Regions:
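Cytosolic juxtamembrane N-terminal segment immediately preceding the first transmembrane helix
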Residues: 1-39
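Hydrophobic transmembrane architecture of multi-pass small-molecule transporters
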Residues: 3, 9, 17, 410, ...
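Flexible interhelical linker loops that connect adjacent transmembrane helices
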Residues: 14-19, 146, 194-221, 236-241, ...
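12-transmembrane solute porter fold
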Residues: 24-41, 45-49, 56-73, 82, ...
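Helix-loop-helix hairpins in multi-pass membrane proteins, especially solute transporters
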Residues: 47, 71, 78-216
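Transmembrane-helix signature of multi-pass solute transporters
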Residues: 100-110, 192-196, 254-258, 330, ...
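A membrane-interface helix-boundary motif in multi-pass transporters
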Residues: 175-187, 233-244, 432-456
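C-terminal membrane-cytosol helix-exit motif in multi-pass small-molecule transporters
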Residues: 187-205, 221-233, 251-265
Length: 456
């Protein structure tokens, strides 16, 4: 019995304990650069939606697919991170994922139609999906456990500030040179990241020819895709009055049942649901789902509203979103301080701030001033910064290093699902209320309306 104890202890030791400080810093810089770039591409289209909508002759909900389908593809492909890392090694998977999303980002800028743009955005999300979970796994393994809070804060800034940099710089470039250059700007930095990762990441041997559980992967993918289609097209097709929506709902339910049944009975399932037996991990997954729902939605909905109805230029919209990045930076430093007291304080405080910022936005109208929007964006940033660090540390506090890659993949899967589904629901609600408001307004229009206005 005593002989097994050292093996357990060894499994809990990070490989990075033996790395020099200089090597850790280089790994940190290159990994954070790659994850920042990928996070930048997630929402880079948010300030570009109005321009792309005109260029592609698309409706509001159609052009939003360029956002939601990218996040959906990321969500579907993220769970494959564990298998890819085991099959090809973390270094190779991380490096070539950065290269792939760099190439697909260039192709997004070169797209000439809505269909091609959505195709390349889907490939961009799917091929780059391993970057975020692998980045966090590599960093946590490269640093001693006592520095986990610091590393998580730095990585969190990359994940949160990346989506802020994209719309901000993208808005400026689109106003000066057109929306395509917001995508093109990623390419040279992406190639630098690819070369840097190749030079700095330590080589790791694949664990062998691990068989992919195709039943689990396909059933999960079909479930997510069908639910996303229901949410994206439901309002346009009048929900369950449409045969398509009914069929997609039935297929989603059936595929989800297959996924759960198979995962609980297979010897090596695609996702190990037994990780959910860890109470902290299960609670963390629930909270990160909510975090994903409230994190990206304002950044998708506000830019079209401000540009189309309030007449804000792209550059000013980018500056408003940039305030969110400033708030996030403040939030991360606050999270480190609060975490020394009790992580639960950070979680409660962060989600409370997020709720207050949403309540604040409920009261704005088209006469809102820039200062109010920037202040609200700043509060949102502080909230997401304060939440991220304690949420990540608490979720993975009991997860063994051997399960870290798979656990991280599920964590980011639920974060992306929360974002994608809630964005689609929000846009469906906007389309519904817009139609209802239009109907009410037309009730007061008749042939005499213009005559009375002229006489007045």
């Amino acid at each position: 019995m005593s002989s097994s104890a050292p093996a357990v202890d060894a499994a809990q030791v990070s490989p990075g304990e033996s790395y020099s400080t200089g090597r850790r810093v280089l790994i940190l810089v290159m990994v954070v650069l790659g994850s920042t770039l990928y996070a930048t591409t997630l929402l880079i289209a948010s300030t570009l939606l109005p321009q792309m909508q005109g260029a592609m002759s698309a409706t509001q909900d159609e052009i939003a697919w360029a956002m939601t389908f990218n996040i959906l593809a990321t969500a579907v492909a993220t769970p494959m991170t564990g298998w890819l890392a085991a099959r090809f090694g973390r270094r190779e998977t991380m490096m070539w994922s950065v290269f792939a999303f760099t190439v697909t980002t260039f192709m997004c800028g070169a797209a000439e139609s809505l269909e091609t743009l959505i195709l390349w955005r889907v490939l961009q999300g799917a091929l780059g999906a391993p970057v975020i979970p692998l980045s966090q796994t590599i960093l946590l393994d490269s640093f001693p456990k006592r520095q986990a809070g610091f590393v998580t804060s730095i990585f969190g800034m990359a994940v949160v500030i990346g989506p802020v940099i994209g719309p901000t710089v993208g808005g400026m470039l689109s106003e000066l040179y057109g929306w395509r250059w917001a995508f093109y700007m990623i390419v040279p930095v992406g190639m630098v990241s690819f070369i840097g990762l190749r030079l700095t990441l330590p080589r790791d041997a694949p664990t062998g020819r691990v068989a992919l559980d195709w039943t689990g992967f396909l059933s999960l993918s079909v479930t997510i895709a069908c639910v996303q289609l229901v949410l994206s097209r439901g309002q346009r097709l009048d929900w369950f009055e449409s045969r398509e929506i009914v069929v997609e709902t039935f297929v989603a339910a059936l595929a989800f049942w297959v996924f759960i049944a198979h995962s609980l009975t297979a010897s090596r399932p695609f996702l190990n649901l037994r990780l959910l037996l860890d109470r902290k991990y299960a609670i963390g997954l629930t909270l990160v789902l909510i975090y994903g729902m409230v994190n990206f939605t304002p950044m998708v909905l506000l830019p079209p509203l401000l540009q189309q109805h309030a007449g804000f230029p792209d550059q000013l919209i980018g500056e408003i979103i940039a305030a969110r990045g400033v708030g996030a930076t403040i939030g991360f430093f606050l999270a480190i301080f609060v975490g020394r007291i009790d992580p639960r304080v950070g979680l409660v405080g962060g989600f409370t701030l997020q709720a207050l910022s949403g309540w604040w936005l409920m009261g704005i109208d088209l006469n809102v001033d820039t200062g109010t929007l920037m202040a609200n964006s700043l509060v949102q940033g502080v909230a997401i910064g304060v939440i991220w660090v304690p949420l990540t540390l608490v979720t993975f506090s009991n997860v063994a290093p051997a399960n870290l890659a798979e656990g991280m993949a599920v964590y980011h899967l639920l974060r992306n699902i929360g974002s994608s589904f809630f964005i689609s629901l929000s846009i469906a609600e906007i389309v519904r209320t817009t139609g209802a408001n239009y109907s009410r307004m037309t009730e007061f229009l008749n042939p005499t309306t213009g005559r009375w206005r002229c006489r007045g």
